[in-house]
Regions:
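Bacterial signal peptide processing site
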Residues: 23-25
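Pocket-lining segment of extracytoplasmic ligand-binding domains
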Residues: 73, 164, 240, 245-335
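Bacterial N-terminal signal peptides that target proteins for export
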Residues: 1-10
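C-terminal solvent-exposed extensions
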Residues: 371-398
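Secondary-structure end/capping motifs
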Residues: 302-380
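Ligand-binding clefts/hinges and TM-proximal coupling segments of bilobed small-molecule sensing domains
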Residues: 85, 214-231, 236-238, 313-345, ...
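Short, glycine-/small- and polar/acidic-enriched structural segments
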Residues: 28-234, 238-241, 257-263, 274-281, ...
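C-terminal motif of bacterial Sec signal peptides marking the signal peptidase cleavage site
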Residues: 17-21
Length: 398
């Protein structure tokens, strides 16, 4: 066995051990609002009403602030071929599908989905709306474990999460793969509103917080944002971990210049005049890329191709419901505690994410992300983009 393969196995083992530690974190020690146990606060602030001024036109983050119309960032960029329409799709297995399912190892066993909230709640919504049942499946939810550990060990079958969370572990040998597109957007780089930082160029030579740590989701996303603007994330800035709940205080003390936050958590502080956005995954150049994808245990997909297809059909039908009926879906999520904060804010933010992306859109965005990760050195255990795509991208819809 060559040294590269041994190193990849060691990295994968270390990642799994780290994930186990994360999964065993007690609720008392978790950051309040960190619903997905990933170091970020994904939901809005309870009991805080904010004024929402909708816009008919899209503006990128810095432009929207300069124009005094912050909400223009959340008007979706219209992209042909992005939306996958499965709202009226009949999930009932055909006779041929049913016969094939009966021959697969997963037949008669429940689908285990990662119970998640907010923008990653598609698999949970699919169960609540009985879409798995319609697809001829039974389902159980799993909580309290990282998505990488749960999918990689086969304890969970399916989940929605960030490409930035899962891509590097896949290249390090974790047994999972991407099977469909979930949504765009949801993370933005924020500074203090009264600071001197107007663009990412102004951040050179400063410290920037990536709340869930070096090498994790926020680190990878921030690297991509800075790189897109010609800023070297390894040499032009210092990326460091300050948790989401402590970022504002750290900025006020001058310890960091900026912080990557979820838009739902930051929104009330923006409206209160505390924060300002300077770069976002909703900016037009990033709106052509998925932020989050549907992932499954890779061995499960290989051994149960028809089960995998029916599972993804169910999740994508849930995503279509969330996209096409945004207000209804938002109230639905709020009623179940899967969104938090102001209703109008959540309607706008949920609408901006354009849930349920086509395989063609997802494949194109994933290929670009793989190329960027290789160039930036974020992936180190593999160096061939085609081989990475073959490992990480296994679409299951016909």
């Amino acid at each position: 066995m060559n040294a590269k393969k041994i190193l990849a196995m060691i990295l994968a083992l270390c990642l799994m051990l780290m994930a186990t530690a994360c999964g065993s974190t007690t609720p008392q020690s978790q950051i309040k609002g960190d619903l997905n146990i990933n170091g970020q606060i994904e939901v809005g602030q309870e009991g805080v009403d904010v004024e929402v001024n909708l816009s008919d036109v899209h503006m990128d983050a810095a432009e929207a602030f300069a124009a005094g119309h912050w909400e223009a960032l959340f008007t979706p960029v219209q992209i042909e071929g992005r939306a996958l329409d499965m709202l009226n799709f009949d999930l009932t297995p055909t006779a041929e599908e049913k016969a094939a399912m009966e021959k697969e190892p997963a037949y008669g066993k429940p689908v285990v989905y990662m119970m998640s909230d907010g923008c990653t709640s598609g698999p949970t919504v699919a169960d609540d709306l009985k879409y798995y049942t319609e697809a001829g499946l039974t389902a159980d939810g799993l909580k309290g474990m990282s998505v990488v550990e749960a999918l990689g060990t086969g304890k969970a079958t399916v989940a929605v999460n960030h490409i930035a969370t899962m891509l590097v572990p896949i290249t390090n040998g974790v047994d999972m793969t991407f099977v469909g597109g979930a949504h765009i957007g949801c993370k933005t780089l924020y500074v203090l509103n009264d600071s001197q930082y107007k663009t990412t160029e102004d951040l050179k030579g400063t410290n920037i917080s990536v709340p869930n740590g070096i090498g994790n989701t926020d680190y990878n996303i921030t690297c991509m944002m800075l790189d897109a603007d010609g800023i070297n994330p390894q040499t032009d800035v210092t990326l460091m971990q300050v948790t989401a709940d402590a970022c504002v205080s750290a900025m006020e003390r001058g310890e960091i210049s900026a912080c990557l936050l979820s838009d739902s958590f930051a929104y009330a502080m923006v409206k209160d005049g505390k924060l300002r956005a300077i770069r976002s995954l909703l900016d037009e150049d990033f709106a052509h890329n998925n932020c989050c994808v549907i992932a499954m245990n890779r061995t499960y997909v290989e051994q149960n191709p028809v089960h995998a297809k029916k599972i993804i059909q169910a999740v994508q039908k849930a995503h279509s419901f969330m996209r096409e009926n945004t207000a209804e879906a938002t109230q639905y999520l709020l009623d179940r505690g899967w969104n938090a904060g102001d209703f109008d804010m959540n309607v706008m933010l949920n609408g901006s994410m354009q849930f349920g992306t086509t395989d063609a859109f997802t494949q194109a965005s994933l290929k670009q992300i793989v190329d960027n990760y290789l160039r930036l050195g974020l992936i180190q255990s593999m160096n061939n983009a085609d081989e990475i795509m073959a490992l990480a991208w296994r679409p299951v819809l016909d």
